[in-house]
């Protein structure tokens, strides 16, 4: 576990996205810090923007099969990610901040209820999983409201039992609720997780960390 802030912000999930293949991070972080992030998550780090924006956590989602990004990605950004051996796909349509609207692991993808058929097809093709539309706590931006690994998914504290059951069925893992950064309900904004480790915003409390570790499988 690594408590972190990116340029003074505890909302690290906005600026980083981890899969089991790599972690994207905003490009203006110190090299030693980036090395610490890669070591904690057990995957190589790729420093990049997406569409010229440093909010790469909001604009990318993925799993071991690939990385789905906003269709505003530039060619040189795509080349940088693909150079790390990662397959890149683009999310079509107006709702294209992939990290905000997709939460995925290697068993499934749970996506914004308003995604078009073409967008859902892009999710399924890039990530090689079946996708299910839905909400969490009535929130369509499910990528901000949940964080998943291959062992669990942590969700918005007001997610309903029916929503938790639906995301469990989709991702094939245990789901529970929690918060980050001293009560923030959009857990995706302050948590970056992979199977080997995780980063949390530096305002996250001990009880919040306990729930993260229990839900995402870091405690055996």
UniProtKB/Swiss-Prot annotation:
Transmembrane segments: none annotated. GO terms for biological process: cytosolic ribosome assembly. The keyword Protein biosynthesis applies. Keywords: Initiation factor, Protein biosynthesis. SUPFAM superfamilies: Pentein. It holds the Pfam family eIF-6. One of its GO terms (molecular function) is translation initiation factor activity. Belongs to the eIF-6 family. Binds to the 50S ribosomal subunit and prevents its association with the 30S ribosomal subunit to form the 70S initiation complex. This is Translation initiation factor 6.
């Amino acid at each position: 576990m690594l408590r972190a802030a990116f340029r003074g912000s505890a909302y690290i999930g906005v600026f980083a996205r981890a899969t089991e293949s790599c972690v994207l991070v905003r490009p203006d972080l110190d090299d030693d810090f980036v090395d610490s992030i890669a070591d904690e998550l057990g995957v190589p780090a790729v420093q990049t923007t997406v569409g010229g924006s440093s909010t790469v956590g909001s604009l990318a989602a993925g799993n071991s099969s690939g990385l789905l990004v906003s269709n505003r990605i530039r060619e040189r950004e795509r080349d940088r990610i693909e150079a790390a051996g990662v397959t890149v796909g683009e999310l079509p349509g107006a709702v294209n901040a992939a990290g905000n609207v997709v939460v995925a692991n290697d068993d499934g993808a749970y996506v914004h209820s308003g995604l078009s058929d073409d967008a859902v097809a892009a999710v399924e093709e890039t990530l090689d999983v079946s996708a299910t539309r839905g909400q969490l706590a009535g929130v369509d931006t499910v990528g901000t409201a949940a964080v998943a690994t291959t062992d669990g998914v942590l969700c918005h504290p007001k997610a309903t039992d029916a929503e938790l059951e639906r995301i469990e069925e989709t991702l094939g893992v245990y789901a529970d609720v929690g918060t980050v950064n001293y009560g923030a309900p959009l857990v995706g904004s302050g948590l970056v997780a992979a199977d080997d480790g995780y980063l949390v915003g530096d305002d996250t409390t001990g009880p919040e960390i306990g729930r993260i570790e229990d839900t995402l499988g870091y405690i055996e």
